[in-house]
Amino acid sequence: MITIYFEGHALTSDNEANLASGHNDVDLSDGGRSQAAGEKRQRYEGLGIDTIFTSDLRRAYDTAKLMFEGRNIPIFQDARLRECDYGDLTQRPRTEMKAVRAESISNPFPNGESLQQVMDRMKNFIDDLSPNYHGQSILIIGHAGTLWGLEHHVNGIPLTKLISGEFVDTGTFTI
Protein backbone atom coordinates (compact mmCIF):
# COMPACT_ATOMS: atom_id res chain seq x y z
CA MET A 1 0.00 0.00 0.00
CA ILE A 2 1.16 3.53 -0.80
CA THR A 3 -0.39 6.66 0.67
CA ILE A 4 -0.33 9.52 -1.81
CA TYR A 5 -0.91 13.09 -0.70
CA PHE A 6 -1.55 15.66 -3.42
CA GLU A 7 -0.92 19.39 -3.13
CA GLY A 8 -1.39 21.94 -5.86
CA HIS A 9 1.52 24.29 -6.50
CA ALA A 10 1.43 27.68 -4.80
CA LEU A 11 0.15 30.82 -6.54
CA THR A 12 1.82 32.23 -9.63
CA SER A 13 1.39 35.53 -11.45
CA ASP A 14 -0.60 33.60 -14.10
CA ASN A 15 -2.98 32.31 -11.40
CA GLU A 16 -3.40 35.81 -10.03
CA ALA A 17 -4.14 37.15 -13.54
CA ASN A 18 -6.54 34.23 -14.21
CA LEU A 19 -4.45 32.93 -17.12
CA ALA A 20 -4.10 29.29 -18.22
CA SER A 21 -0.41 28.43 -17.65
CA GLY A 22 -0.25 24.93 -19.12
CA HIS A 23 3.40 24.19 -19.93
CA ASN A 24 4.47 27.83 -19.45
CA ASP A 25 7.22 27.66 -16.83
CA VAL A 26 6.02 30.59 -14.73
CA ASP A 27 7.53 31.43 -11.33
CA LEU A 28 5.69 31.61 -8.04
CA SER A 29 4.42 35.06 -7.14
CA ASP A 30 5.40 36.74 -3.86
CA GLY A 31 2.07 35.58 -2.45
CA GLY A 32 2.77 32.05 -3.70
CA ARG A 33 6.16 31.95 -2.00
CA SER A 34 4.54 33.04 1.27
CA GLN A 35 1.76 30.49 0.79
CA ALA A 36 4.24 27.63 0.21
CA ALA A 37 6.44 28.55 3.18
CA GLY A 38 3.41 29.13 5.41
CA GLU A 39 0.07 27.33 5.19
CA LYS A 40 1.18 24.66 2.71
CA ARG A 41 4.26 23.83 4.81
CA GLN A 42 2.20 23.58 8.00
CA ARG A 43 -0.32 21.23 6.38
CA TYR A 44 2.32 18.47 6.09
CA GLU A 45 4.18 18.85 9.38
CA GLY A 46 4.18 15.55 11.25
CA LEU A 47 2.68 13.47 8.42
CA GLY A 48 5.79 11.36 7.84
CA ILE A 49 6.27 12.07 4.15
CA ASP A 50 8.98 9.75 2.78
CA THR A 51 9.37 11.07 -0.77
CA ILE A 52 8.16 14.08 -2.75
CA PHE A 53 7.46 14.16 -6.47
CA THR A 54 6.78 17.35 -8.42
CA SER A 55 6.26 18.17 -12.05
CA ASP A 56 9.36 19.51 -13.76
CA LEU A 57 7.82 22.98 -13.95
CA ARG A 58 9.34 25.57 -11.59
CA ARG A 59 6.09 26.46 -9.89
CA ALA A 60 5.66 22.91 -8.57
CA TYR A 61 9.32 22.27 -7.71
CA ASP A 62 9.76 25.65 -5.99
CA THR A 63 6.60 25.01 -3.96
CA ALA A 64 8.15 21.76 -2.69
CA LYS A 65 11.49 23.40 -1.88
CA LEU A 66 9.78 26.11 0.17
CA MET A 67 7.42 23.69 1.90
CA PHE A 68 10.19 21.31 2.96
CA GLU A 69 13.16 23.64 3.39
CA GLY A 70 15.46 22.32 6.10
CA ARG A 71 13.98 18.82 6.01
CA ASN A 72 15.82 15.83 4.67
CA ILE A 73 13.16 14.49 2.29
CA PRO A 74 14.10 13.67 -1.31
CA ILE A 75 12.37 15.70 -4.03
CA PHE A 76 12.14 14.22 -7.53
CA GLN A 77 10.92 16.05 -10.63
CA ASP A 78 8.92 14.09 -13.19
CA ALA A 79 7.62 15.53 -16.49
CA ARG A 80 4.65 13.12 -16.41
CA LEU A 81 3.20 15.26 -13.60
CA ARG A 82 3.00 18.37 -15.80
CA GLU A 83 -0.17 20.30 -16.40
CA CYS A 84 -1.93 19.82 -19.73
CA ASP A 85 -0.27 21.54 -22.69
CA TYR A 86 -2.91 24.08 -23.69
CA GLY A 87 -1.05 24.91 -26.90
CA ASP A 88 -2.36 28.13 -28.45
CA LEU A 89 -4.44 28.79 -25.31
CA THR A 90 -1.38 28.94 -23.04
CA GLN A 91 -1.37 32.23 -21.12
CA ARG A 92 -4.78 33.10 -22.48
CA PRO A 93 -7.65 33.85 -20.09
CA ARG A 94 -8.74 30.67 -18.29
CA THR A 95 -12.29 31.24 -19.53
CA GLU A 96 -11.10 30.63 -23.11
CA MET A 97 -9.46 27.34 -22.13
CA LYS A 98 -12.46 26.25 -20.04
CA ALA A 99 -14.81 26.97 -22.96
CA VAL A 100 -13.21 24.17 -25.01
CA ARG A 101 -12.04 21.88 -22.19
CA ALA A 102 -14.82 19.28 -22.62
CA GLU A 103 -13.97 18.94 -26.33
CA SER A 104 -10.31 18.57 -25.37
CA ILE A 105 -10.82 15.35 -23.44
CA SER A 106 -10.09 13.39 -26.60
CA ASN A 107 -9.18 16.16 -29.06
CA PRO A 108 -5.96 18.06 -28.32
CA PHE A 109 -6.06 21.76 -27.56
CA PRO A 110 -4.88 23.58 -30.73
CA ASN A 111 -1.12 22.85 -30.97
CA GLY A 112 -1.27 21.24 -27.51
CA GLU A 113 -2.38 17.94 -26.03
CA SER A 114 -5.65 16.32 -25.03
CA LEU A 115 -6.71 15.71 -21.46
CA GLN A 116 -6.65 11.98 -22.26
CA GLN A 117 -2.94 12.32 -23.00
CA VAL A 118 -2.51 13.83 -19.54
CA MET A 119 -4.45 10.90 -18.06
CA ASP A 120 -2.18 8.47 -19.93
CA ARG A 121 0.92 10.19 -18.49
CA MET A 122 -0.54 9.97 -15.00
CA LYS A 123 -1.45 6.29 -15.41
CA ASN A 124 2.15 5.57 -16.40
CA PHE A 125 3.42 7.46 -13.34
CA ILE A 126 1.01 5.68 -10.96
CA ASP A 127 1.96 2.29 -12.39
CA ASP A 128 5.64 3.07 -11.73
CA LEU A 129 4.93 3.93 -8.08
CA SER A 130 3.43 0.58 -7.09
CA PRO A 131 6.52 -1.64 -7.22
CA ASN A 132 8.96 1.02 -6.02
CA TYR A 133 7.32 2.82 -3.10
CA HIS A 134 5.30 0.14 -1.30
CA GLY A 135 4.69 1.06 2.35
CA GLN A 136 5.63 4.71 1.88
CA SER A 137 3.82 8.01 2.15
CA ILE A 138 4.55 10.23 -0.81
CA LEU A 139 3.56 13.78 -1.66
CA ILE A 140 2.88 14.85 -5.22
CA ILE A 141 2.97 18.58 -5.92
CA GLY A 142 1.43 19.35 -9.27
CA HIS A 143 -1.43 20.87 -11.19
CA ALA A 144 -5.13 20.38 -11.93
CA GLY A 145 -4.31 17.75 -14.56
CA THR A 146 -2.15 15.89 -12.04
CA LEU A 147 -4.96 15.73 -9.50
CA TRP A 148 -7.51 14.73 -12.15
CA GLY A 149 -5.21 11.88 -13.18
CA LEU A 150 -5.10 10.62 -9.59
CA GLU A 151 -8.85 10.99 -9.11
CA HIS A 152 -9.55 9.28 -12.44
CA HIS A 153 -7.14 6.35 -12.13
CA VAL A 154 -7.23 5.72 -8.37
CA ASN A 155 -10.86 6.55 -7.56
CA GLY A 156 -12.46 5.84 -10.95
CA ILE A 157 -14.06 9.27 -11.31
CA PRO A 158 -14.96 10.05 -14.94
CA LEU A 159 -12.92 12.83 -16.48
CA THR A 160 -16.10 14.57 -17.67
CA LYS A 161 -17.16 14.93 -14.03
CA LEU A 162 -13.74 16.08 -12.85
CA ILE A 163 -13.39 18.89 -15.38
CA SER A 164 -16.86 20.26 -14.65
CA GLY A 165 -16.29 20.59 -10.90
CA GLU A 166 -14.40 23.11 -8.84
CA PHE A 167 -10.68 22.44 -8.45
CA VAL A 168 -9.65 21.56 -4.91
CA ASP A 169 -5.87 21.67 -4.53
CA THR A 170 -5.41 18.84 -2.02
CA GLY A 171 -6.23 15.16 -1.89
CA THR A 172 -5.26 11.84 -0.31
CA PHE A 173 -5.19 8.51 -2.16
CA THR A 174 -4.23 4.93 -1.38
CA ILE A 175 -2.93 2.51 -3.98
Positions of PLM-derived features:
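Short beta-strand scaffold positions
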Residues: T54-S55, D120, I141-G142
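Short active-site segment of divalent metal-dependent hydrolases/proteases
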Residues: T12, T146-L147
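Short aromatic-enriched loop/helix-cap "lid" or pocket-rim segments at secondary-structure transitions
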Residues: E16-L19, G87-Q91, H153
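Phosphate-handling substructures
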Residues: V26-D27, E69-K123, I163
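Domain-level recognition of soluble alpha/beta enzyme cores
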Residues: N155-I175
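Active-site-proximal alpha-helix that buttresses catalytic centers in soluble enzyme cores
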Residues: I2, E7-R71
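Generic beta-sheet signal
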Residues: I4, Q136-A144
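Glycine-rich phosphate-binding loop signature in dinucleotide/nucleotide-binding domains
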Residues: Y44-G48, L129-Q136
